[in-house]
Amino acid sequence: MRLLIDTHVLIWLMVGSPKLTKRCIKLLRDEGCEVFFSAASLWEVALKHERKPDKIPVAAEQVERYCRECGIRQVPVRFEHALKTCELEKIHADPFDRMLVSQALVDGMKLVSHDEDVIAYGDAVIAV
C-alpha cells in the first residue's frame, strides 16, 4: 500500500509526539507499505513555522532532511493534483489538506491523517 503522510502526522512522527497512535506507527513501519510526504507539506510547515514556531516546532528544511534520512519519498505538486482540488467535495476549506487529499486520489495512495475534516473524505484517507 502507498501511504501519504498528513503534515501533522509527519511532525508528530519527527518530534515523537504522544498523539501518534500505535495503529499509525504500526502502519508506517509495515514493510508492505511505501511511505510518502508531499512537497505541499513542506510549504505548509514553512509558512506556519514562520508565523507560529511554538505550534510548529520544526522548520521545512528539518522535515525534508528527516524524510530523506528515513527513506520517506517526496511527492511533488503537479498540475493534475491542482485540478483535482477543484473536483473535491467542499468538506474542508484548508488548501493544504485539500491538496493532500487530491494527491492521494490522483496517485493511488491513502492519506494517513488524524484530522476529522480530512477523514470525512472517506476512502482516500486512513484515520489514525
Residue ranges of each PLM-predicted region?
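Phosphate- and divalent-cation-binding pockets in alpha/beta enzyme and binding domains
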Residues: 44, 84-87, 120-121
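Residue-level signal for well-ordered alpha-helical positions
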Residues: 16-17, 48, 88, 124
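Generic structural signal for small/hydrophobic residues in well-ordered secondary structure
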Residues: 7-8, 45, 85, 104
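Short, well-structured N-terminal submotif of metal-dependent ribonuclease cores
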Residues: 1-37, 50-65, 69, 107, ...
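A broad detector of the eukaryotic-type serine/threonine protein kinase catalytic domain
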Residues: 29, 47-50, 87-90
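Active-site neighborhoods of divalent-metal-dependent phosphate/nucleic-acid chemistry enzymes
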Residues: 56-61, 68-116, 128
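Active-site regions of enzymes building and remodeling cell-envelope glycoconjugates
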Residues: 122-128
